[in-house]
A protein has these predicted regions:
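Short amphipathic alpha-helix that is part of the acyltransferase structural core
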Residues: 1-37, 149-183
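N-terminal charged segments
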Residues: 6-55, 60-63, 69-72, 93-96
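A conserved beta-strand-loop-helix scaffold within acyl/acetyltransferase catalytic domains
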Residues: 25-45, 62-70, 178-234
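Hydrophobic beta-strand residues of extracellular immunoglobulin-like
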Residues: 48-51, 203-206, 250
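Acyl-donor-binding surface of acyltransferase catalytic domains
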Residues: 65-152, 292-296
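A conserved beta-turn-beta hairpin within the catalytic core of GNAT-like acetyltransferases
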Residues: 66-76, 83, 106-107, 201, ...
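Conserved acetyl-CoA-binding loop-helix of GNAT-fold acetyltransferases
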Residues: 84-100, 232-236, 241-258, 263, ...
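C-terminal "cap" of GNAT-fold acetyltransferases
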Residues: 136-157, 262-274, 284-303
Length: 303
């Protein structure tokens, strides 16, 4: 097995690997070159990313991000045709070694995310990891344009050009208590949202109450091939419980339908305290697949 750091020339083969893993584990391939290029822009390739080769083939991918409080987030992928060759074990070994090296004191924690399968669950448990959070990919097949019921006292409109900083602030407040949320400055946030070439403010609804921004949804047209994508739905705490989240999602369904989308998907924290997953189920969305985040407490310094 050969383990090395990637170069920009590895982008396309890395995406091919990630898509093969997604297709095998979830039935849906979502990664594309734009997404991985954006992800790599937040990492240092020579320190945070590994490629694993077996018999000259790209067999595995892993990356790692250190967050405040001694938390280390890592993602790992093994090509479905090359599983059982020790790649997954090597990914975990390197991730743990690097996490210990980068967290100075005992009590650091390493988090890994993987699609939920009996094999993956057994693999992580056998190496001292425990599941701490579950996330779902949910979708709906739209047969007709949904009706949108706007709650009393609420105004729904689309984002106005130039108010993106205010929308960013709203969504940061809405997700401030979300599990493992990391507050990002506007420039970093906009790089993955408002500055994208396919960002369309006329596809993104905003809710106002008495002229105050109360909630918003960032949506993307054909972001996943023939799927519409609801990227972020947030309602600030002071305005929750008034049906605003449901109105934003219904509006998003309706506008995507008018633009020709018949399938719409989103990702959600299955344990979100606001009950978002239950809301989406009530609106007719079904779970396509579920992924677990696994945690291991790191004790002792790296050797």
């Amino acid at each position: 097995m050969n383990v090395r750091r990637p170069t920009p020339d590895d982008l396309a083969p890395a995406v091919e690997l990630l898509r093969a893993v997604e297709e095998a584990d979830t039935g849906e391939a979502e990664w594309d070159e734009r997404q991985l290029r954006e992800h790599w822009s937040t990492l240092e390739l020579e320190h945070d990313v590994w490629l694993f080769e077996v018999d000259g083939r790209l067999a595995g991918y892993a990356d790692l991000e250190v967050r405040p409080g001694g938390r280390v987030m890592s993602d790992g992928y093994v090509h479905p045709e090359l599983r059982g060759r020790g790649v997954g074990s090597e990914i975990l070994r390197l991730a743990e070694e690097e996490a210990r090296r980068r967290t100075d004191a005992d009590g650091g924690r390493l988090y890994l995310q993987n699609a939920t399968t009996s094999h993956a669950d057994g693999f992580y448990r056998s190496r001292g990891f425990s599941p701490v959070r579950r996330f779902r990919r949910m979708a709906i097949e739209l047969e007709r344009e949904p009706e949108v019921d706007v709650p009393p006292g609420v105004v729904l409109r689309t984002i106005h050009r130039g108010e993106e900083p205010a929308i960013h602030a709203l969504l940061e407040d809405a997700f401030a208590e979300h599990w493992e949320h990391r507050r990002r400055g506007y420039e970093e946030y906009a790089e993955r949202t408002f500055d994208r070439g396919d960002y369309d403010p006329t596809l993104c609804p905003v809710a106002e109450v008495d002229g105050v921004l109360a909630g918003a949804s960032l949506n993307w047209w054909k972001d996943m091939g023939d799927w519409g994508w609801i990227g972020t739905v947030g309602v600030v705490p002071a305005f929750r419980g008034r049906g605003i989240g449901e109105a934003l999602v219904r509006w998003s369904f309706a506008e995507l339908f008018r633009r020709g989308e018949r399938r719409v998907a989103l990702g959600v924290d299955a344990q979100n305290e606001t009950g978002a997953a239950r809301l989406y189920e009530r609106l007719g969305m079904r779970t396509l697949w579920e992924a677990a985040v696994w945690e291991k407490e790191l004790r002792g310094a790296a050797s």
